[in-house]
C-alpha cells in the first residue's frame, strides 16, 4: 500500500488481477517456486540428476539367459535388451516393476491413478525415475544394469528380483520384494559395506510428475504427501536401516538421499504406517519377510505341473504362466507396456477362470465383483477404477463383455460344483442409459437399490443381448467391440458373436436345468441364433 497508494493505484491491492501480499513466513516457499526474484542476485541451481547411468539398447541384443527351476537369469554387459525386460512384483495392494535397469515404477492400489514413482516413458527407455548408485573412482556406478563397464546378472524369481554386480572389491547383491500384508517395497542390499550410496527418485504420489508434493524429513524417515493424491490422505514414507541425508529438487520433483552402507542395508518406501516401516528397515525383519514371500508363491505355483518334452514350454507353464496371470493381470494390472490399473469386465474374468485348477478364489471374487459392476439393464462397465468414494469406469455399447459373466459362471459351477455361488445376492449399478448419440460414457455410477442373485445377473446379461437385436441374417449386431476393440465403429452382424452368444445360451440353459431353476426351455427357444449360426459355419 505504501508504494501503490501515492501513485493512485491503491485499487489494485487485493483485487482480481491486482497485487497481493503474502505473509513473511511464506517468502522462502515463494522464492523456491519463482522463476525470477527481483532485487536479489541470481542463484545458480544444479539439477539433482547425475550423468546418465543407463546402458544403450541394441535392437538386435538378446542377453545370455538361463533357467534354474523358477529362477530366470540373464546377464547384461554394457548393452541392454532391445526392450525393457521387466518383472511385476505385488502383494495385491502395493505393486512395483523391476527391470534390467533396476526399480522402474511403484504404485499403491492402482498403477494408473496412484503411482508413487512413475514408470519409464516407454519400453525402449534406458533410464528410470529411480536410480541407486555408488561412487567408484570418482564416477557414479549403478547397482543395476548400466553403461558403466561393470557386468550385471539379473534374476527374476516369483515375488522377487535380484541384481548382482561386482564393483571394485565389492560383490553387491540387491533384492527387491514386497511383503505380504504390508504396503511397502523393500530393497535389501548385501555387500556394499562402507560404500557411500546415493538413492535418487522422482516421486509422483498420484499427481503428475510430483508437481504438488510436500516433503517432510524426520530422524530416519522421510514423509511425502500430495493434494493431488487419488486416495486422499495417503502418504508415502521412505526409510532405511542407514541414516538418511536427503536433499530435494523441484523440476522434476526429485529426492536425493545419501547413505553410508553396512554389511546389509535396507531401503524401504511405501504407504504403510511409520511403525511398520521402521520395523521393516531392520535386516532381520526384511530377510524373514522375503522368506515368507517366497513361501507364498511356492505354495501357489506348486499346485500345477506340466511335462511335455519341451523344456522351454515346461519352464514357462510350470509356474511362470500362473505367476504372470496373478501378479501382472489380476493383482498388479500393470506393466511398462500398459499401465492400466483398471479392472476389466471380460479380461479378468478370463484370467481368473483360467486359474480354477490353481485357486478357485480368484474366479469367485471376479464373478461377484463383475455382478456388482452390472447395470440393472444388463449391460456392464467395460472397465473401472476402484475408489473408496465410488468406482469410476466406462459404460459402453460393447457387444461381448457382458456375456463373459455367463461363460465364467457356467465354467465355475461345472469345475467346482459350488452351486451356492449362483444364489448370492449382489446389487446392480444405476445411471441414465446411454443416449442414442453417446458411444460410451466415463462416469461414477451409483449403487442401485435393486439387487439380484448371481444367476439372475447372468440371465440379465443374456436378455440384454437379445434386446439389442439381430440383423437381417439373424445374427447379433457387432455393437462396439465384439472382442476386438478395433471394430468399435464397424457395425454390421457378427458370426463370432453369434457363436459365442449361442454357446453361452446353451451352457446357461444346462446350468438352469442343473439347478432346477425356471427358464431353461425359454432360453433355448428364444435364442433362434443357435440355428442361424450353424448355417454360417
Locations of the language-model features?
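Extended glycan-interaction surfaces of carbohydrate-active proteins
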Residues: 155, 301-342, 365-387, 454-490, ...
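Catalytic cores of carbohydrate-active enzymes
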Residues: 381-382, 500-537
Amino acid at each position: 500500500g505504501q508504494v501503490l497508494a501515492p501513485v493512485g493505484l491503491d485499487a489494485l491491492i487485493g483485487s482480481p488481477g491486482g497485487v497481493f501480499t503474502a505473509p513473511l513466513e511464506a517468502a522462502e516457499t515463494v522464492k523456491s517456486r519463482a522463476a525470477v526474484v527481483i532485487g536479489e542476485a541470481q542463484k545458480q541451481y544444479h539439477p539433482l540428476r547425475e550423468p546418465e547411468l543407463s546402458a544403450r539398447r541394441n535392437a538386435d541384443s538378446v542377453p545370455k539367459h538361463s533357467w534354474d527351476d523358477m529362477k530366470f537369469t540373464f546377464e547384461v554387459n554394457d548393452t541392454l535388451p532391445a526392450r525393457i525386460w521387466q518383472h511385476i512384483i505385488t502383494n495385491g495392494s502395493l505393486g512395483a516393476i523391476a527391470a534390467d535397469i533396476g526399480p522402474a515404477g511403484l504404485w499403491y492400489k492402482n498403477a494408473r491413478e496412484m503411482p508413487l514413482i512413475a514408470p519409464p516413458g516407454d519400453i525402449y527407455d534406458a533410464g528410470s525415475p529411480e536410480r541407486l548408485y555408488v561412487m567408484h573412482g570418482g564416477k557414479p556406478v549403478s547397482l543395476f544394469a548400466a553403461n558403466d563397464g561393470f557386468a550385471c546378472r539379473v534374476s527374476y524369481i516369483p515375488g522377487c528380483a535380484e541384481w548382482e554386480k561386482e564393483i571394485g572389491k565389492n560383490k553387491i547383491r540387491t533384492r527387491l520384494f514386497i511383503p505380504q500384508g504390508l504396503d511397502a517395497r523393500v530393497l535389501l542390499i548385501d555387500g556394499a559395506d562402507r560404500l557411500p550410496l546415493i538413492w535418487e527418485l522422482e516421486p509422483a504420489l498420484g499427481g503428475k510428475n510430483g508437481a504438488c508434493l510436500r516433503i517432510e524429513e524426520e530422524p530416519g524417515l522421510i514423509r511425502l504427501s500430495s493434494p493431488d493424491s487419488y486416495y486422499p490422505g495417503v502418504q508415502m514414507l521412505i526409510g532405511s536401516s542407514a541414516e538418511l541425508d536427503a536433499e530435494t529438487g523441484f523440476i522434476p520433483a526429485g529426492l536425493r538421499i545419501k547413505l553410508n552402507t553396512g554389511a546389509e542395508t535396507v531401503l524401504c518406501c511405501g504407504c504403510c504406517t511409520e511403525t511398520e516401516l521402521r520395523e521393516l528397515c531392520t535386516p532381520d525383519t526384511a530377510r524373514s519377510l522375503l522368506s515368507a514371500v517366497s513361501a507364498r508363491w511356492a505354495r501357489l505355483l506348486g499346485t500345477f505341473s506340466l511335462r511335455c518334452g519341451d523344456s522351454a514350454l515346461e519352464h514357462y507353464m510350470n509356474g511362470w504362466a500362473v505367476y504372470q496371470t496373478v501378479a501382472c493381470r489380476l493383482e498388479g494390472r500393470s506393466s511398462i507396456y500398459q499401465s492400466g490399473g483398471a479392472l476389466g469386465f471380460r479380461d479378468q474374468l478370463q484370467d481368473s477362470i483360467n486359474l480354477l485348477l490353481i485357486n478357485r478364489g480368484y474366479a469367485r471374487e471376479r464373478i461377484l465383483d463383475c455382478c456388482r459392476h452390472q447395470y440393472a439393464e444388463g449391460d456392464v462397465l467395460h472397465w473401472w477404477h476402484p475408489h473408496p468414494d465410488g468406482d469410476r469406469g466406462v459404460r459402453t455399447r460393447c457387444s461381448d463383455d457382458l456375456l463373459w459373466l455367463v461363460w465364467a459362471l457356467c465354467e465355475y459351477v461345472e469345475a467346482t460344483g459350488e452351486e451356492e455361488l449362483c444364489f448370492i445376492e449382489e446389487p446392480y449399478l444405476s445411471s441414465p442409459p446411454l443416449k442414442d448419440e453417446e458411444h460410451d460414457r466415463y462416469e461414477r455410477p451409483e449403487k442401485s437399490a435393486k439387487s439380484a442373485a448371481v444367476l439372475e445377473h447372468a440371465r440379465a446379461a443374456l436378455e440384454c443381448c437379445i434386446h439389442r437385436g439381430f440383423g437381417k441374417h439373424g445374427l447379433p449386431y457387432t455393437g462396439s467391440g465384439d472382442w476386438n476393440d478395433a471394430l468399435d465403429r464397424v457395425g454390421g452382424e457378427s458370426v463370432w458373436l453369434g457363436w459365442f452368444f449361442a454357446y453361452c445360451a446353451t451352457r446357461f440353459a444346462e446350468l438352469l436345468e442343473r439347478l432346477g431353476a425356471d427358464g431353461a426351455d425359454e432360453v433355448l427357444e428364444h435364442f433362434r441364433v443357435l440355428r442361424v449360426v450353424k448355417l454360417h459355419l
